[in-house]
C-alpha cells in the first residue's frame, strides 16, 4: 500500500521516499556540470520545500546524533539514480580499494554540514551538459 504525503512517496516495505522524477528534475536544475549532494540539496529544497521538510523530520541533519541523515539518504539516491540507463548523470564510481575516484575532500564549511572529510562528486552526462531545466 502506498502512502502519499505532500508529494513524498512512502512505500510500505520499500525504501523509496522521494520519487525518482523529483531526483531527476532537481539534478537538471543544478547549475553546475559536476556537483555534490550539498549542491543538489540547495536546488531540491527550493523546488520541493514540503518534501525537504519531511525528509529532515525523518532523517535529521548532520549533528542530530543520527548515523543516516538526509544528506546520506540523498547522496545514496543520487548514486543509485546515476546507474540507471536513462539517468542524466554519469555512473558514480563507489569507493573501492582505497581509491576515491568520484570523491573530493570537503571544505571546512562543507564538513560542518556534511560531517565527512570526503564527499561524492556527481557528473552530468555530456549530452545533458547545457540542458538545465527551469522550474
Segments and roles (model prediction):
Residues 40-41:
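A short acidic, leucine-rich amphipathic alpha-helix
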Residues 2-26, 50, 56-135:
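Phospho-regulated, low-complexity intrinsically disordered regions of nuclear gene-regulatory
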Amino acid at each position: 500500500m502506498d502512502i502519499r504525503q505532500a508529494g513524498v512517496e512512502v512505500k510500505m516495505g520499500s525504501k523509496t521516499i522521494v520519487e525518482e522524477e523529483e531526483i531527476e528534475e532537481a539534478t537538471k536544475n543544478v547549475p553546475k556540470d559536476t556537483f555534490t549532494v550539498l549542491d543538489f540539496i540547495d536546488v531540491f529544497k527550493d523546488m520541493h520545500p514540503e518534501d525537504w521538510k519531511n525528509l529532515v523530520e525523518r532523517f535529521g541533519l548532520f549533528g542530530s546524533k543520527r548515523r543516516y541523515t538526509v544528506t546520506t539518504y540523498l547522496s545514496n539516491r543520487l548514486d543509485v539514480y546515476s546507474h540507471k540507463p536513462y539517468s542524466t548523470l554519469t555512473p558514480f564510481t563507489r569507493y573501492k580499494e582505497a581509491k576515491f575516484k568520484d570523491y573530493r575532500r570537503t571544505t571546512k564549511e562543507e564538513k560542518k554540514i556534511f560531517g565527512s572529510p570526503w564527499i561524492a562528486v556527481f557528473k552530468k552526462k555530456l549530452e545533458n551538459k547545457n540542458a538545465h531545466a527551469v522550474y
